[in-house]
């Protein structure tokens, strides 16, 4: 007698399950198992089977979804965002186009200090509504799991406010969120002459954040003019002692040694890495620290030097991709666009890109055993794409290829409708 399950997806043109026993590094990122003419079975929010046509034999479903030859993949994972913030900074773009430097904009109260001011002034409810709007956009582009950082408070109450908003978001809408405490995002004006005291203030928040389960990771911006390698080492060691996973904004501009520090501390991820040295790349590979690359930021800032993804992959580094969604240097929720930029400017292949936005991204935020793969027992988080094959998504840029998004086996995005009028 056939076993009854909730849903079966049939007539899948190509299926990427992204099955892996761990994050993919180096040459293994090129190994992509593509299943043609595939099926997926779902019951009680979990994957029952995902494979070649015929795997559905012995099952009957309450609902049959005909994918009509479309591509199906796991839901995408965005492992680096600054989702919770007040205000916006579109005026700065015009100022930059007029030749005004970022330092001059900062001196006028703009830049990150503008976002800090707006985030401090916003109520928790205002931040919640704004972040929810942006998160719905992320979901519409196929992101079903994401990381979110604090870091626009730079003082106790606002940092905690940002983290509370992220926790409420996680509990109230479909996208799974992993929170990172990034009080060490910048040095506020009141601490410009004493950054060590500021770091002590941020470290003092760790027990409360841990007790209230507001964040899983701690992050710091290691860069010229922000925090030194020595300061970052002390901060991250204290965070590790408090039970937090470690992340680091490393070498975005200068090869300061952030990647080497990430490797030495065995951080879960090191992010940005535009200026990382050969030695830094080697240390990341040796430590198994995941490189989260943010090419959308380089693109938006109009810079020509991108992170050296090819050198990292050749050295055996595990590479991931993220939007870095934030109001100043990467105002986009569209991870599909990031996939295209990675192909064009990081010279990553389509196979490498798919690993970078699914399984590797999931491991970069501690969700490797839950997200980024379609296999029996995993949550049924998947995307049905209006695309004939996996290479089409990074190839055809600037549009949304999502047809439907499923989260825990339920359709949460449906773009089937025709344009009216």
Swiss-Prot record:
CDD domains in the record: Imidazolone-5PH
Known cofactor(s): Zn(2+); Fe(3+)
Protein location: Cytoplasm
Domain of life of the source: Bacteria
EC number: 3.5.2.7
Recorded GO CC terms: cytoplasm
Catalytic reactions of this protein: 4-imidazolone-5-propanoate + H2O = N-formimidoyl-L-glutamate
Chain sites annotated for binding N-formimidoyl-L-glutamate: 152, 326, 328
Binding site for 4-imidazolone-5-propanoate: 89, 152, 185, 252, 329
Subunit structure: Homodimer.
HAMAP family: HutI
Name of the protein this chain belongs to: Imidazolonepropionase
Organism: Bacillus subtilis (strain 168)
């Amino acid at each position: 007698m056939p076993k009854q399950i909730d849903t079966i997806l049939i007539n899948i043109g190509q299926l990427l399950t992204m099955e892996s026993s761990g994050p993919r590094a180096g040459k293994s990122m090129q190994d992509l198992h593509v299943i043609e003419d595939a099926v997926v079975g779902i019951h009680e929010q979990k994957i029952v089977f995902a494979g070649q046509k015929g795997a559905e034999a012995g099952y009957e479903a309450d609902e049959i979804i005909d994918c009509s030859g479309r591509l199906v993949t796991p839901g995408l994972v965005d492992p680096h965002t600054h989702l919770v913030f007040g205000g916006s900074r579109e005026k700065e773009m015009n100022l930059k186009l007029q030749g005004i430097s970022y330092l001059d904009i900062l001196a006028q109260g703009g830049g990150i200090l503008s976002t800090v001011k707006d985030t401090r002034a916003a109520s928790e409810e205002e931040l919640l509504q704004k972040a929810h709007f942006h998160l719905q956009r992320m979901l519409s582009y196929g992101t079903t799991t994401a990381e979110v950082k604090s870091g626009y408070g730079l003082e106790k109450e606002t940092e905690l406010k940002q983290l509370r908003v992220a926790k409420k978001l996680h509990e109230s809408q479909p996208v799974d969120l992993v929170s990172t405490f990034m009080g060490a995002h910048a040095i506020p004006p009141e601490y410009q002459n004493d950054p060590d005291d500021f770091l002590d203030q941020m470290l003092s928040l760790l027990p409360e954040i841990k007790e209230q389960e507001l964040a899983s990771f701690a992050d710091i911006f290691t860069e010229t003019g922000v925090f030194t390698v020595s300061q970052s080492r002390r901060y991250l060691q204290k965070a590790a002692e408090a039970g937090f996973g470690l992340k680091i904004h490393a070498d975005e501009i200068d090869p300061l040694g952030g990647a080497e520090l990430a490797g030495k501390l065995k951080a879960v991820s090191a992010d940005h890495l535009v200026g990382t040295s050969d030695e830094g790349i080697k240390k990341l590979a040796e430590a198994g620290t995941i490189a989260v690359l943010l090419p959308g930021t380089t693109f938006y800032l109009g810079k020509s030097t991108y992170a050296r993804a090819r050198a990292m992959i050749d050295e055996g580094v595990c590479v991931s991709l993220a939007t870095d969604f934030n109001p100043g240097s990467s105002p986009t929720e569209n991870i599909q666009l990031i996939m295209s930029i990675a192909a064009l400017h990081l010279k990553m292949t389509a196979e490498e890109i798919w690993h970078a936005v699914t399984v590797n991204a999931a491991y970069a935020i501690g969700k490797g055993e839950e997200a980024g793969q379609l296999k029996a027992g995993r949550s049924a988080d998947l995307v049905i794409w209006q695309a004939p094959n996996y290479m089409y998504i990074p190839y055809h840029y600037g549009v949304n290829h999502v047809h439907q998004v499923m989260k825990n086996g339920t359709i949460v995005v449906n773009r089937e409708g025709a344009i009216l009028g």
